[in-house]
Every structure is written in structure tokens, then in C-alpha cells.
Amino acid sequence: MQHLEDVKINNSIVWFKPNAQPNITCRFFTESTEHLIWASKNGNGKKWKFNYEATKNLIEDRLNPKGKQTRNVWAIPLTPKAEKRAGKHPTQKPIELLRRIILACSDEGDTVLDPFLGSGTTSFVAKMLKRNSIGIEKENKYLPIIKKRLNPPQKTWDDIELEVIR
């Protein structure tokens, strides 16, 4: 991260998992949250995007009533089995989590970066929402899951170019 000065941390979002996995060791608190970092590229005078008015209607859960200012804590269940058809990843995020952040912080045609692509959820959702995406994943063992997820055999989708850089 030698160019960290080019990145602005805009906000953090706490993902509260109402159906978190139990703590089977009974030696610490049950882990029921994760943190997302919303960052943007600094420079050239361009401001980051935040669709404030839209977030009041697109984000609704028990912590965020529809029509109200959106908080940075979102209650979203764990990734359902149906979203793991391309394969399992130990930290896969639910589509709804990425849908919210991408709709809130970008417009159609914008580019979304995920430096920890994992199973490809961010790129998958970005494509569904007509955004471009750049994903980085250092673990080669997850490439088959990413490829399967981003190149589904469906006639309704455009082909997604996937470039593997080693």
C-alpha cells in the first residue's frame, strides 16, 4: 500500500449478522459483525459518489427504517446457500450487502474495486447493476469459483472478460 495517500476512507459500514454462526468453543463472544471500508481515490478534484436520497429508499432493515437517513450499521443475514452455487468461500458476502454499497456509492458505468475478491460477489453484483469492476484475489484456489460465478451459462448476460494476472 505504498500509495495510501491517494486513498480517502469515506466511511466504514458495520455488517450485523442476525443469524451469525454460534461460538462452539464458548470461550469468547459470538462474532456477529464485520466491517466494510468505503474508500475512494483522492485527487483531480473529483468528489466521490454518495446517492444520499436513494439510500433512504434502497436500504431497509430493522436498523434502517425506509425513508429515514441511513445508518452505517446494516442487519443482513449470512450468505444463503443459493448464492454459493458456484462454490464455497470461507468469507463469502451476501449479494444484498454488496448491492447496497454499490448502489449507494456509484452510478451506472462507474468502476468498483475489490482488492479481496474472494468468490467474486462484488464483481457479480457490479455487473448486475451495470458497473465495471476490478477484482484482485491472491489465492489461485478461488479462481474456478470466480470464473464460474462471473461466466454463468445464461443467455441474458453479456460475456464478462476475466483476466488472470499472476
Q: How does the language model describe each region?
A:
Residues 1-145:
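Core catalytic lobe of class I
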